[in-house]
């Protein structure tokens, strides 16, 4: 590598955090094509995945938890796509053209798996992409919480599929019908907070990637940035009243496990 590897990573993080186009990278960083080439290389050979998974295990151990989670939370987010590319679709419910980010997180919000697919793919089909083979990676995982968008009174087939094919007990967290508008649902708020972490990286505010694999890699890089800072004792997250309340809720729920 002709350029310092740390500077290459700094350039990739600059693109992630600021949302700038690769070609607009400042001249005091490495040339944009060099940074993009290494980002693409590390996406293809699984480097981002390996680094991410190692850091996640270290964070869980540092928090006094087993590296292998036993429960998780599932959710999706539709991201508008400005560019063309692979796997672009129309989400009729959100009236958005782009891709869906399906993520599975542990009970503290750390990413376990991310799958990016066309926004036209329904929630139940997207959930199967995430849960298929998940226990091969996380053998202790037995319970997954999700919202009511994954099942309805007519079609509850995903619950049976999860038990039969994934060995997972999928538990739906219902909304309170008496409350209108936004609700903070037990367990479910954890994955929403993870989406908010990702949203602080402007590259992830929308989907700018041409390939779903690169979109998944950007999610991993965002979590790598977050977890590396956490292990180093650095605070890169805003600490307002919302974050303080979220931390209190998390501590309460973890103490009950």
Residue spans for each PLM region:
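Short alpha-helical elements
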Residues: 1-257
């Amino acid at each position: 590598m002709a350029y310092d590897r740390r500077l290459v990573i700094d350039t990739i993080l600059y693109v992630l955090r600021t949302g700038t186009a690769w070609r607009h990278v400042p001249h005091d960083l490495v040339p944009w094509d060099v940074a993009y080439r290494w980002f693409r290389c590390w996406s293809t050979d699984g480097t981002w995945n390996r680094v991410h998974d190692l850091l996640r295990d270290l964070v869980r151990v540092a928090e006094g938890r087993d590296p292998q989670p036993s429960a998780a939370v599932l959710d999706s987010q539709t991201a508008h796509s400005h560019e063309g590319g692979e796997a672009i679709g129309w989400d009729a419910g959100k009236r958005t053209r782009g891709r869906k980010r399906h993520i599975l997180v542990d009970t503290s919000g750390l990413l376990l798996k991310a799958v990016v697919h066309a926004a036209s793919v329904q929630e139940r089909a997207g959930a199967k992409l995430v849960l298929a083979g998940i226990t091969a990676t996380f053998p202790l995982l037995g319970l997954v919480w999700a919202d009511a968008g994954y099942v309805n009174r007519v079609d509850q087939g995903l619950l049976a599929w999860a038990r039969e094919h994934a060995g997972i007990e999928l538990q739906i967290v219902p909304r309170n019908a008496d409350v209108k508008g936004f609700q903070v649902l037990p367990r479910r708020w954890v994955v929403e907070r993870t989406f908010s972490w990702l949203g602080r990286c402007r590259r992830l505010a929308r989907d700018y990637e041409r390939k779903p694999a690169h979109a998944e890699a950007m999610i991993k890089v965002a979590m790598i940035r977050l977890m590396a800072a956490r292990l180093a004792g650095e605070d890169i997250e805003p600490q307002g009243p919302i974050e303080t309340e979220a931390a209190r809720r998390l501590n309460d729920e973890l103490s009950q496990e």
